């Protein structure tokens, strides 16, 4: 099995991101699980201020990374459920995985849990003016 490692990056210190990924990857190295790490330090440095990642084009950055989910069996989110709620990029990565039948996991406090249910609620409202 190969998993794509997802973790919040925008607004986070580069060293913290590297440490989270390293900690998780070292645990996975003891298993039969291979990892794809989308974090590129060179790119992070180009998009940081004082060592804090500040994506200038977050959607472009996300798309460049998320395309690699295709090569993986699933996505493993590194962080707490609260971290996930606050990370638009990681939410999108998990939604991509679920939508295409891939497994999703969360690595929190040294434990891995599998996502068993994802509920999306779509609600639309008529637009009063014409779209141009």
Question: Language-model segments: which ranges?
Answer:
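Conserved catalytic or regulatory cores that recognize and/or transform ribose-phosphate-containing ligands
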Residues: 1-132
């Amino acid at each position: 099995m190969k998993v794509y490692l997802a973790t919040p990056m925008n607004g986070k210190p580069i060293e913290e991101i590297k440490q989270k990924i390293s900690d998780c990857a070292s645990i996975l190295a003891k298993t039969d699980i291979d990892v794809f790490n989308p974090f590129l330090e060179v790119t992070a440095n180009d998009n940081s201020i004082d060592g804090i990642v500040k994506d200038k084009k977050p959607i472009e950055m996300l798309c460049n990374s998320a395309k690699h989910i295709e090569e993986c069996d699933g996505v493993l989110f590194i962080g707490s459920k609260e971290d996930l709620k606050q990370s638009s990029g990681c939410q999108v990565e998990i939604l991509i995985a679920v939508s295409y039948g891939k497994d999703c996991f969360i690595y929190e406090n040294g434990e891995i849990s599998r996502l068993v249910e994802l509920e999306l609620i779509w609600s639309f409202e008529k637009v009063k003016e014409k779209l141009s």
